[in-house]
Amino acid sequence: MKKIAIDAMGGDHAPKAIVEGVNQAIEAFSDIEIQLYGDQSRIESYLVKSDRVSIVHTDEKINSDDEPAKAIRRKKNASMVLAARAVKDGRADAVLSAGNTGALLAAGLFIIGRIKGVDRPGLLSTLPTVDGSGFDMLDLGANAENTAEHLHQYAILGSFYAKHVRGIAKPRIGLLNNGTEATKGDSLRKEVYKLLASDSSLQFIGNVEARDLMSGVADVVVADGFTGNAVLKSIEGTAMSIMGQLKSAIAVGGVKAKLGALLLKGSLYDLKDTLDYSSAGGAVLFGLKAPLVKSHGSSDAKAIFHTIKQVRTMLETDVVGQLVEEFSKESDAND
């Protein structure tokens, strides 16, 4: 049985969206147990009772405006902290939260801990492509500054995730840059390019540009945390703008626009599904000793369900256990 600790109080729509997503997951998957951390009475008002769901009550939670490291240290009974502690103590196999991103990353690093040999765990998410296959990208903001060695390690981590979680036999690795030529980019990008090109264990396809990401140019895209986060926000904003413009055009376009929308209803839903990255799950802080997944702060029940599904897949494939083994081999080889 796979045990998942969930911060029920994190996110814009907590605990309602969190608990409703849990209800869906419990019905869909018979091999998971959920531990919900938070206000018991509020959780119970939305929970469909199940012997595979338990509640650990706490009145304390980490707010969106709390300073991450301080919150983790001072709010020792916060729902997020207790969920992470359950993983560290072996009472749960993975942790999920839609709460304060910085605090969750801090909880992952300080409570769960990183895998030996991993210098900087990276925030990884599967983002949409026009063909629906998606691509994995990291780092999406766990680290504001990176070295070339960090990005080389992100390529290894991303390739490992794509193989074991998404089932891609030979993931194509691309380095996000301002041009596709090998000579493009600043000194960091040029150094990373050399490291990736010389690593025979990776299927490195070279530099990729931001404009080509959603066309599926690569299965894994590597970036420093600052750049990766900026690209993530751009993709999110573009998707929301496109859907907003379509809705507005239909609403004010009169009868012809509404008839056209009716005829294109199926295609419009397909477009919405393509741009909706929530169905791929949340962002993984990959490189920790256990799966830690951050769901978007605005997640609804559907997004929480898909994030639980993602965590279940990570546990089913034992991707973290295999990653520990892989890095221990590298560590032994370097000793």
Swiss-Prot record:
Q: Where in the cell is it found?
A: Cytoplasm
One GO molecular function term of this record is: phosphate:acyl-[acyl carrier protein] acyltransferase activity
GO BP? fatty acid biosynthetic process; phospholipid biosynthetic process
Q: Is Protease included in the keywords of this UniProt record?
A: no
Pfam families with a match to the protein in the record? FA_synthesis
Class of the enzyme per the UniProt entry, highest EC level: transferase
Native source organism of the sequence: Streptococcus equi subsp. zooepidemicus (strain H70)
- The protein depicted here goes by the name Phosphate acyltransferase
Provide the primary localization: cytoplasm
Query: What is annotated about its quaternary structure and interactions?
Result: Homodimer. Probably interacts with PlsY.
